[in-house]
Amino acid sequence: MAAPWVLPAPLSPAQLKRLEQHRYSSAGRSLLEPWLQPYWGWLVERLPPWLAPNAITLGGLLLNCLTALPLIASCPTATEQAPFWAYILGALGLFIYQSLDAIDGKQARRTNSSSPLGELFDHGCDSISTVFVVLGSCIAIRLGTNPDWLFFCCFVGLFMFYSAHWQTYVSGILRFGKVDVTEVQIAITMLLLVSAFCGTAVWDYKVHLVGLELKFFAVVGILCGTAVSCFNYFRIIFGGGVGKNGSTIAVAHMTKSEISLQDTAFIGPGLLFLDQYFNSFIDEYVVLWIALFISLFDMLRYATGVCLQIAAHLHIHVFRISSHQAPEQVQNHND
């Protein structure tokens, strides 16, 4: 058996017991969803019945990350012009990820393999993918020319993801707005295609009527969407993450338990804070790499520990459809 610091068991017996009572519940329908449902239905019918939903989710995440990496590597400051194929690859990877993310739940219901582990796996992968999607969109419109806006757009995506699951933690229902994640992913796919065929310089074109570059219209759209979504989320939160944080709040909601204030996820940011506090006595670039590896290791060990622990408790497999499956756990908004 692996040491606890390598492969922890984050959930208590009481949390695992409450996990059995969890039922996924969602409400709302976004604008594009009715139009995409036939495509998603057709796509899921092409999948073999032995393919596990979690394998679909993980495959989509890996594809999205791998297709975004060439774009990130080509544009380290989000001001460069990447090769044509990098934008096409990023757009294709994001579209495929969106498609797979939409059908993993359908495959679970189709094969009678729905479980709390599948919901957690889906949200956990989304929390990681959010980082790459946001970076891809910022690179597509060359937002690195305005570092303040780049910083804002990167973190507003993570904040909105966390807030969506925060209101789910409070209300027990994952709510979808008219403009939600599907619309955002399709819009970013279009941004990548425009940058591929027109070049990123097109986003620097200034609209003389208002004196603003085209890229700022995208930022204004983000601002408006954020304001509306925040109003809807916090109206529920006050009335009642991302990365590991996004997974942690999903686990807390599903196990009906409190979120721990002490978390090893704070080690990486803590190192960066201390290095700044002591006037960068260690090179910032070195500390950033150290924080990255610590955070990556911490996220992987937490996610692996939770998935294996839940799978063992429910007597199911993570990446295989088991002969014994948990009872139906889904109350969906769009089926």
Swiss-Prot record:
Chain ranges passing through the membrane: 53-73, 84-108, 116-140, 151-169, 181-197, 213-238, 267-276, 284-313
Compartments, as annotated in UniProt: Golgi apparatus membrane
Residues binding Mg(2+) 1: 101, 104, 122
UniProt binding sites for Mg(2+) 2: 101, 122, 126
InterPro entries associated with the record: CDP-OH_P_trans (IPR000462), CDP-OH_PTrfase_TM_dom (IPR043130), CDP_ALCOHOL_P_TRANSF_CS (IPR048254), CHOPT (IPR014472)
Database matches in Pfam families: CDP-OH_P_transf (PF01066)
Alphabetically ordered keywords of this record: Golgi apparatus, Lipid biosynthesis, Lipid metabolism, Magnesium, Manganese, Membrane, Metal-binding, Phospholipid biosynthesis, Phospholipid metabolism, Transferase, Transmembrane, Transmembrane helix
Documented EC number(s): 2.7.8.2
Catalytic activity: CDP-choline + a 1,2-diacyl-sn-glycerol = a 1,2-diacyl-sn-glycero-3-phosphocholine + CMP + H(+); 1-octadecanoyl-2-(5Z,8Z,11Z,14Z-eicosatetraenoyl)-sn-glycerol + CDP-choline = 1-octadecanoyl-2-(5Z,8Z,11Z,14Z-eicosatetraenoyl)-sn-glycero-3-phosphocholine + CMP + H(+); 1-hexadecanoyl-2-(9Z-octadecenoyl)-sn-glycerol + CDP-choline = 1-hexadecanoyl-2-(9Z-octadecenoyl)-sn-glycero-3-phosphocholine + CMP + H(+); 1-hexadecanoyl-2-(4Z,7Z,10Z,13Z,16Z,19Z-docosahexaenoyl)-sn-glycerol + CDP-choline = 1-hexadecanoyl-2-(4Z,7Z,10Z,13Z,16Z,19Z-docosahexaenoyl)-sn-glycero-3-phosphocholine + CMP + H(+)
Pathway assigned in UniProt: Phospholipid metabolism; phosphatidylcholine biosynthesis; phosphatidylcholine from phosphocholine: step 2/2
Active site: 123 (proton acceptor)
One GO MF term: diacylglycerol cholinephosphotransferase activity
Cofactor requirement: Mg(2+); Mn(2+)
Cellular component, GO, one term: Golgi membrane
Record-listed CDP-choline binding positions: 54, 109
Membrane-protein topology: Multi-pass membrane protein
Predominant location category: Golgi
Site, as annotated: Increases basicity of active site His: 119
Family: Belongs to the CDP-alcohol phosphatidyltransferase class-I family.
Function: Catalyzes the final step of de novo phosphatidylcholine (PC) synthesis, i.e. the transfer of choline phosphate from CDP-choline to the free hydroxyl of a diacylglycerol (DAG), producing a PC. It thereby plays a central role in the formation and maintenance of vesicular membranes.
Protein name, UniProt field: Cholinephosphotransferase 1
Source organism: Gallus gallus (Chicken)
Lineage: Eukaryota, Metazoa, Chordata, Craniata, Vertebrata
Gene this chain is encoded by: CHPT1
